[in-house]
């Protein structure tokens, strides 16, 4: 089954790993999809800049699944060097979302 996989690198990271990535490379042009809480923390830390656009991740599994590919296309359109996505919950209800995100993040490495 074919899934959309951006050509841009798409690591799936925990919130603290996203924060560390942005801190370690202040010039990294990254597009992000993170939770509201993580977005606030990054903004309060001064880690969100004009070359780091953010999409707030949907809070429910149904909304996340419904908006996933549109959000990936929007993130790619920003033209960033990397797309950092905060890992969604790993509970069984989110299994399909996690599978689709994993495919989107990994497929480009098979080329």
Language model feature labels by segment:
Residues 1-106, 110:
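A C-terminal functional module that forms or caps the active site or interfaces directly
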């Amino acid at each position: 089954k074919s899934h959309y996989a951006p050509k841009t690198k798409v690591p799936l990271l925990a919130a603290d790993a996203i924060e560390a990535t942005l801190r370690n490379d202040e010039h990294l042009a990254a597009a992000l999809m993170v939770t509201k809480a993580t977005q606030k923390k990054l903004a309060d830390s001064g880690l969100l800049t004009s070359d780091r656009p953010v999409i707030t991740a949907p809070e429910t599994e149904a909304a996340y699944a419904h908006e996933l590919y549109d959000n990936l296309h929007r993130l790619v359109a920003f033209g960033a060097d990397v797309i950092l996505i905060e890992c969604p919950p790993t509970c069984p209800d989110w299994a399909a979302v996690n599978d689709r995100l994993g495919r989107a993040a990994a497929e480009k490495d098979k080329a």
